[in-house]
Amino acid sequence: MLKTHSCALTQENVGTEVTLAGWVHRRRDHGGVIFIDLRDREGIVQVIFNPEQSAACLDIGKELRSEYVLQVKGVVSHRPAGTENNRMPSGMVEVVAVNAKILNAAKTPPFYINEEVEVDESLRLKYRYLDIRRQGMKNNLIIRHKAVRFMREFLNDQGFIEIETPILIKSTPEGARDYLVPSRLFPGKFFALPQSPQQLKQLLMVAGMEKYYQVARCFRDEDLRADRQPEFTQLDMEMSFVDEEDMMKLMEDLFTGLVANVRPDMKYNKKFPRISFADAMEKYGCDKPDLRFGMELADITDIGASSAFGVFKNVAAQGGAIKAISAPGCGGYNKSQQEELINLAKKYGAAGLVPISLGVENGVLKDLTMEMVKSVAAKYLALEEIKTIAERSGAKPGDLILIVAGARKMVNTVLGEMRNQLAVKLNLCDKNELSFAFVVDFPLFQWDEEGKRWDSVHHPFTAPLESDMPLMDTDPGRVGSRAYDVVCNGYEIAGGSIRIHQADLQRKVFHLLGYNDEQIDERFGHLLEAFEFGAPPHGGVAPGIDRFVMLLAGETSIREVISFPKNQAAQDLLFGAPSVVDDKQIKDLHIRIQAEKE
């Protein structure tokens, strides 16, 4: 080894002769004595090049620049009194160099490595190997390593077996587009990269493995967001002879144990509340609510229906919904700020937004007067009606009530989005808190109005509630599913369900989704045949590793916790991928590139 110790030295190392190797983090010349901060993965330590100790070392010290790779030998000493640095773990000690060797020089980096400054993301991704040298990125990857290590150890202790499944599989589209791989040996035929190992892990249950997991790489050719990538990693799990309670207990223990092990400084709830899908949509406007703050959606349809406000009366008469949320402390918003909120509501599909300001002074609701109320709706609403709206939405004097009216689904979506965005704007979220919950009682199917057909809410392998089975023939939209999601801070971090394990029921679900028997046998025949050889009851779940590590690291994009991610256009800026390939490679695959028509 070219080093005997890491740079994470402490007072326990005083008097020890060490050989260190790393990168020059900073260099300072103090009148003939040169100080450098030497950095490796574990830490940073100050090294002194003093001519009284070694003139040759000083000459090398004069050559050093930021990011040079350096090996240095010396003795660990206490820093002189008054020169200690309490901001560094190694700030009480220094290394007096007696020998040094430049292992490699370095060009000037395109951005500062030694300062946590904002850098354009495209530049960071192009020079990702330099970006990872920065402390924030390095810490994120270490958190990821610790999280995955804990997951493996936890599941191993629970009797799970880690089994790898194929990356090249058959295309059986499950929602998003597949990434296709043309076969050279079978012209005109294609493999697909797995969107998840769903069918494979179910087949492992048929095979009698009972408890399976893997850290699975998955691929989806879909539009990107801050929390999505074309390739992503999930902790894939499946168990035989379990029900929902077993799986939810496993998830609760896994996530709480993981946080306690990897980020014990974070606040988190050890028991996960359970929220029905319907309640989540009605109270929070989405099926992955952020529970770190209130601002629940309040239904005021009855008040609007009996009020003198024509807009509200018409919506209520047509069977629509009228709902409100309270923006705390925003009663003083001016016309421009309120207009910004109105435009935000319109962006998400609302025809408009009705703000009601309860004045600028904080107070209690019983003291509210009409003189304090400012709104275009004020002349149509009585004071008692406004107080009731405020009471339901949790508003008080000094707050701003925001009301949306229209189709219930749209109202929930708009106010749910506004709730989340206002929480960020108003700093209502504790970044050091993880608020877990289970979302349950999902419907099995949802109606696709555009395609005029039923779709799976989760995926077609999710089992229906046994009590709802008769409804599959008469009213599929009312069939409940045995699905369970884990949500945290506004993200779905794990989705799971008890699976269908009977061939006839699975075929029936496929029929409801619009597949005919020929399509079913061609795409899923292998699974249905396996179910005929004694498939056990089974269930599973798949926590998204990228997304949960993002929350553990306090980041807002999964790109911050992936070593070499794609950008938001699904491009790899470091390697320049996707790229043009050699014509011979295309010919060998028996395919032809068709230029897009302008």
UniProtKB/Swiss-Prot annotation:
Subcellular location(s) of the protein: Cytoplasm
PROSITE patterns attached to this UniProt entry: AA_TRNA_LIGASE_II
Q: What is its EC number?
A: 6.1.1.23
- Catalytic reaction annotation: tRNA(Asx) + L-aspartate + ATP = L-aspartyl-tRNA(Asx) + AMP + diphosphate
Annotated region (Aspartate), positions in chain? 198-201
What InterPro entries does the entry give? Aa-tRNA-synt_II, aa-tRNA-synth_II, aa-tRNA-synth_II/BPL/LPL, Asp-tRNA-ligase_1, Asp-tRNA-ligase_1_N, Asp/Asn-tRNA-synth_IIb, AspRS_core, GAD-like_sf
- Residues engaged in binding ATP: 220-222, 229, 492, 544-547
| Residues that coordinate or bind L-aspartate | 174, 220, 458, 499
Q: Under the cellular component aspect of Gene Ontology, which terms does the record hold?
A: cytoplasm
Location (main, coarse): cytoplasm
Where does the record place the site Important for tRNA non-discrimination? 30, 82
Tell me the GO BP annotations in alphabetical order.
aspartyl-tRNA aminoacylation
| Protein family (similarity comment) | Belongs to the class-II aminoacyl-tRNA synthetase family. Type 1 subfamily.
What does the UniProt function comment say about this protein? Aspartyl-tRNA synthetase with relaxed tRNA specificity since it is able to aspartylate not only its cognate tRNA(Asp) but also tRNA(Asn). Reaction proceeds in two steps: L-aspartate is first activated by ATP to form Asp-AMP and then transferred to the acceptor end of tRNA(Asp/Asn).
Q: Which NCBIfam families match?
A: aspS_bact, PRK00476.1
Q: How does it assemble?
A: Homodimer.
Tell me what this protein is called: Aspartate--tRNA(Asp/Asn) ligase
